[in-house]
């Protein structure tokens, strides 16, 4: 799905890592939430509360989930992160993403 309809968007950005990772929250009528964001090249570590689905819309990166090896992710691919966990990212070029909160 490349477009969302009937949503509310929080105007204030979510800003992480001195502005190198930013996103906007999109709220759906059914109570679910997604964030749409951009990550600049760099190394980052995130913690999760809810289970997440990360869809990579454009970019080039590697991800490491807890207890797993690094793996390459490209535009058009996605990965899931368990609830109450963490993951590491190596961003090699500007990356556009959509994060869905599943829990």
UniProtKB/Swiss-Prot annotation:
User: Which is one Gene Ontology cellular component term of this protein?
Assistant: cytosol
Residues making up the signal peptide according to the UniProt record: none
Which Cys-Cys disulfides exist here?
none
Top-level taxon in the UniProt lineage = Bacteria
Q: Which family does it belong to?
A: Belongs to the nucleoside phosphorylase PpnP family.
Q: What InterPro entries does the record tag this protein with?
A: Ppnp, RmlC-like_jellyroll, RmlC_Cupin_sf
What role is this protein assigned?
Catalyzes the phosphorolysis of diverse nucleosides, yielding D-ribose 1-phosphate and the respective free bases. Can use uridine, adenosine, guanosine, cytidine, thymidine, inosine and xanthosine as substrates. Also catalyzes the reverse reactions.
EC number(s) reported in the record: 2.4.2.1, 2.4.2.2
One Gene Ontology molecular-function label: uridine phosphorylase activity
Protein name as catalogued: Pyrimidine/purine nucleoside phosphorylase
Q: Which UniProt keywords apply?
A: Glycosyltransferase, Transferase
Write out the catalysed reaction. Answer: a purine D-ribonucleoside + phosphate = a purine nucleobase + alpha-D-ribose 1-phosphate; adenosine + phosphate = alpha-D-ribose 1-phosphate + adenine; cytidine + phosphate = cytosine + alpha-D-ribose 1-phosphate; guanosine + phosphate = alpha-D-ribose 1-phosphate + guanine
Q: Has keyword NADP?
A: no
């Amino acid at each position: 799905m490349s477009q969302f309809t009937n949503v509310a968007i929080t105007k204030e950005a979510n800003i992480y890592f001195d502005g190198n990772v930013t996103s906007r929250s999109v709220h759906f009528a059914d109570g679910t939430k997604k964030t749409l964001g951009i990550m600049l090249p760099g190394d980052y570590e995130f913690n999760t509360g809810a289970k997440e689905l990360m869809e990579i819309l454009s970019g080039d990166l590697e991800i490491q989930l807890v207890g797993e090896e690094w793996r390459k992710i490209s535009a058009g691919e996605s990965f899931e992160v368990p609830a109450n966990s963490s993951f590491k990212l190596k961003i090699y070029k500007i990356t556009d993403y959509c994060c869905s909160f599943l829990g």
